[in-house]
Regions:
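Glycine-rich, acidic loop segments that terminate in or are immediately followed by a histidine
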Residues: 2-106
Length: 106
């Protein structure tokens, strides 16, 4: 199971982390990718549960892929990663790309 969502509110990376980890636990260790549109920058986090990790999904790879699209960078571990970029207008494209990737690994 996966949740990929965008918040219009300017949430911090820490806010997104708390929400993502809580949601990951509620969807039985699935994948949660959250984006936030800030005043000047887009922020994203990915939280990946054990079952999804064993299926080849890695949070760091998700964040790197999306961050490049957003004109920035990021990374982390297999279970949690954080990043962002300055091209907030491309969040929709990043969401589509992540959904397509997650469909391909099901």
């Amino acid at each position: 199971e996966a949740i990929v969502a965008e918040f219009e509110a300017d949430l911090s990376g820490e806010d997104l982390r708390v929400i993502a980890i809580d949601l990951r636990a509620k969807i039985n260790d699935g994948v949660v990718v959250l984006f936030s549109k800030g005043q000047e920058r887009a922020t994203l986090v990915a939280a990946v549960g054990a079952a999804a990790k064993s299926g080849g999904v890695k949070a760091g790879e998700i964040v790197k892929t999306a961050s490049v699209l957003l004109g920035g960078g990021g990374g982390g571990k297999d279970d949690f990663a954080q990043g962002g970029g300055n091209n907030q207008e491309l969040i929709g494209d990043a969401v589509k790309e992540i959904k397509k990737f997650l469909e391909s690994v099901k």
